Amino acid sequence: MATAIPQRQLFVAGEWRAPALGRRLPVVNPATESPIGEIPAGTAEDVDAAVAAAREALKRNRGRDWARAPGAVRAKYLRAIAAKIIERKSELARLETLDCGKPLDEAAWDMDDVAGCFEYFADLAESLDKRQNAPVSLPMENFKCYLRKEPIGVVGLITPWNYPLLMATWKVAPALAAGCTAVLKPSELASVTCLELADVCKEVGLPSGVLNIVTGLGSEAGAPLSSHPGVDKVAFTGSYETGKKIMASAAPMVKPVSLELGGKSPIVVFDDVDVEKAVEWTLFGCFWTNGQICSATSRLILHKKIAKEFQERMVAWAKNIKVSDPLEEGCRLGPVVSEGQYEKIKQFVSTAKSQGATILTGGVRPKHLEKGFYIEPTIITDVDTSMQIWREEVFGPVLCVKEFSTEEEAIELANDTHYGLAGAVLSGDRERCQRLTEEIDAGIIWVNCSQPCFCQAPWGGNKRSGFGRELGEGGIDNYLSVKQVTEYASDEPWGWYKSPSKL
């Protein structure tokens, strides 16, 4: 029996609130193309209310209720949220799959990661108190100095549709751990589980206004949030083009932003690999999450000596991937998120073919699936570096292949991109792997694997992939401001000015 999509409202000041204009957006199951529910369509007026609620929560009781509360207080709520996520894991995973098309096994894995992320930042919230008032050594003995780390304030969090609840958690958990209050705007293409997060927060008694959730279109809710004068920082994950707009809207107020944008990441495979292992990692690196990963290693840079064998094995493996309704047991590739994304990916493949590339396999709808936004896992060869398929992010299950002969050529091809989120190198030569980790210009490098991600390690990229790092111990610092406190600690007068004569 299909799980019903709960009919939620916006979540503002700890309560469900109908959108000001009373509008709602359809939720479409990408596996069936059928509407399965609705989400509220928030607009600027709703964003105003959410920001006001966040500001009130930040300042309530002079900050003692949240922003200046002991880290252990905030940690208690984060751990309670984590426990509820695990309690509702099956329900949430199913909702995620219905909403965005992710295979159910992957969605369940995501829910474990969501809970783990809240637990991790709960620990950092507690340890933050121990890091306060850290002394600074000074060259003058008559001064003492220490540092405080304080919440940056009200933060606007704008998140994508490929990992709806997990990507939201990457921002919500550290922001709340730091003592910030937040307004979350998830993607209109996949907001269902983020609204369920609101229900979880209500259930655990999170103080009103600490987390507010406004769903709606990017132009109607996301844009007003990123430009809002009451928001002290914006953190965004999404496309390069939208990231530019967010930077521009924040610039007049000199508002800090952190951006995790697109990628066109390389995976370099040398001729000394175990071919079967390397083929699986190569396909996993591009086809995991239906190919909709910002860090997808979608440019295969393959040594010429093994190119023929490797490509033959990739095609065989790709044809063996189960493409099905993502609720089916064993599904390993579901539909892409929307009709718009489906048409965009088909156009990428068509353009590559028209420019002279060869479609080794895939690029079309599976014959056994008449409905849904499905595309077979696709491998494209005979690619030139000037082609669109090499240069632009597809965000779908499409892998392009380029061959190389020397290590220097491989490095040049790997760095031949405006992006710099991630990269992978597969080789049995550890020294070679080390060289490439240093040479590839990216924020994340995987060695003999692709796509592992742990909340304990920082995540973020270079170049047009954005700036700032999420996760890891530094993840909480994204939402903290450093305050220097310096004290004159001598009984002697400063003595810079001559004291006036006493009458």
Swiss-Prot record:
Active site positions: 260, 294
Binding site for betaine aldehyde: 161-170, 260, 292-295, 453
E.C. designation(s): 1.2.1.8
UniProt keyword terms in alphabetical order: Cytoplasm, NAD, Oxidoreductase, Peroxisome
Disruption phenotype: Reduced crop productivity, but increased accumulation of gamma-4-aminobutyraldehyde (GAB-ald) and higher 2-acetyl-1-pyrroline (2AP) biosynthesis, which influences aroma.
pH-activity note: Optimum pH is 10.
Record SUPFAM superfamilies: ALDH-like
Pfam families the UniProt entry points to: Aldedh (PF00171)
Chain span(s) of sequence motif Microbody targeting signal: 501-503
Record: residues binding NAD(+): 238-243
NAD listed as a keyword: yes
Residues where 4-aminobutanal binds: 260-261, 294, 459
Principal location listed in the UniProt entry: other
GO CC annotations on file: cytoplasm; peroxisome
Impact after mutating residue 162 to A: Slightly reduced affinity for NAD, 4-fold enhanced affinity for betaine aldehyde (Bet-ald), but 3-fold reduction in gamma-4-aminobutyraldehyde (GAB-ald) affinity and reduced catalytic efficiency (2-fold for Bet-ald and 8-fold for GAB-ald)
Catalytic activity, as annotated: betaine aldehyde + NAD(+) + H2O = glycine betaine + NADH + 2 H(+)
EC top class named in words: oxidoreductase
Induction description: Following submergence treatment, transient decreased levels that recovers after re-aeration.
Pathway: Amine and polyamine biosynthesis; betaine biosynthesis via choline pathway; betaine from betaine aldehyde: step 1/1
Subcellular location: Peroxisome; Cytoplasm
Tissue: Expressed constitutively in roots, embryos, seedlings, stems, leaves and flowers, with higher levels in young leaves, and lower levels in roots. Strongly expressed in inflorescence meristem during cell division.
PANTHER family, sorted: BETAINE ALDEHYDE DEHYDROGENASE, BETAINE ALDEHYDE DEHYDROGENASE-RELATED
Subunit record text: Homodimer.
Note: Present in a truncated form, mostly allele badh2.1, also called 'fgr' in fragrant rice varieties (e.g. basmati and jasmine rice). The loss of activity leads to accumulation of 2-acetyl-1-pyrroline (2AP) that confers the flavor of fragrant rice. Haplotype analysis suggests a single origin of the badh2.1 allele within the Japonica varietal group and demonstrates the introgression of this allele from Japonica to Indica.
Name this protein carries in UniProt: Betaine aldehyde dehydrogenase 2
Organism: Oryza sativa subsp. japonica (Rice)
